[in-house]
């Protein structure tokens, strides 16, 4: 474990926030959406079609992912375009995949 992490004692609020973040990863549909966003920005309809899900289901999951700050959105005309919030998201998923492969 890195020394920096060992020296820091997380507050109760930080532990709660971390638990809430990990809850978001507890749904395979959300993982699929994040994984799809690895390759770029997409609108809700594009994501729904590529994942064989309804637009409503994808919108609901994107709302949760946005609240968790894992995705960001921007308006393009009448549509919202979604992308990963930052590189941390792909790093977390990649490390999770490495962990389960061990």
Q: What kind of feature is each model-predicted range?
A:
Residues 1-17, 88-102:
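Amphipathic alpha-helical dimerization/coiled-coil segments
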Residues 4-5, 34-35, 63-64, 82:
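Short amphipathic alpha-helical surface micro-motifs
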Residues 13-56, 69, 76, 80-87:
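N-terminal helix-turn-helix DNA-binding core of bacterial DNA-binding proteins
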């Amino acid at each position: 474990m890195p020394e920096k992490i060992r020296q820091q004692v997380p507050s109760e609020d930080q532990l709660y926030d971390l638990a809430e973040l990990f809850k978001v990863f507890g749904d395979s549909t959300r993982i699929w959406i994040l994984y799809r966003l690895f390759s770029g920005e997409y609108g809700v309809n594009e994501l729904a079609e590529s994942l064989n899900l309804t637009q409503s289901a994808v919108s609901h999951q994107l709302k949760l992912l946005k609240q968790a700050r894992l995705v960001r959105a921007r308006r393009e005309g009448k549509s919202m375009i979604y992308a990963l919030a930052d590189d941390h998201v792909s790093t977390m998923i990649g490390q999770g995949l490495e962990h389960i492969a061990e």
